[in-house]
Amino acid sequence: MLHKKYRPNVAAIIMSPDYPNTCEVFIAERIDIEGAWQFPQGGIDEGETPLEALHRELLEEIGTNEIEILAQYPRWIAYDFPSNMEHKFYAFDGQKQRYFLVRLKHANNIDLNKHTPEFRAYQFIHLKDLLKKIVPFKRQVYRQVIAYFKRDGYL
């Protein structure tokens, strides 16, 4: 059996500024794959902590890192890239992620074009509608992380 290689990565479940009064999460549609909606996420650079990577990735991807950190998933969680996907990260079989639950402080600060755009559109959607919008190969990870934050009373 071959040893799989996973790219270290952070991901953010971003609650709207109205949280906890409204339970809506931020998702964005990838610019390179039409219809592929997901949470913001990105690689951890060498020497960077997951928290540092989170702030950098949010600034790069959504134009703001003005967030309040609510909780962190306690373990790394991995997923494999689908076999039919062109591997942007061909040296890796998938990604291992550290998830953060955060609240966005100001929705009007979102700017998908602040850096090199990775997303074409974004929306805040109710948690119950989330999995219908997400690419299938990420759904199990999303289910697991959402269930954890629900059990802990955050969602």
Curated annotation (Swiss-Prot):
InterPro entries: Nudix_hydrolase, NUDIX_hydrolase-like_dom_sf, NUDIX_hydrolase_CS, NUDIX_hydrolase_dom, RppH. GO terms for molecular function: mRNA 5'-diphosphatase activity. Residues 5-147 form the Nudix hydrolase domain. A motif (Nudix box) lies at residues 42-63. GO terms for biological process: mRNA catabolic process. GO terms for cellular component: cytoplasm. Its cofactor is a divalent metal cation. It comes from the Bacteria. Its EC number is 3.6.1.-. It holds the Pfam family NUDIX. Keywords: Hydrolase. PANTHER family: M7GPPPN-MRNA HYDROLASE. Belongs to the Nudix hydrolase family. RppH subfamily. HAMAP family: Nudix_RppH. Accelerates the degradation of transcripts by removing pyrophosphate from the 5'-end of triphosphorylated RNA, leading to a more labile monophosphorylated state that can stimulate subsequent ribonuclease cleavage. This is RNA pyrophosphohydrolase. It comes from Helicobacter pylori (strain G27). The gene is rppH.
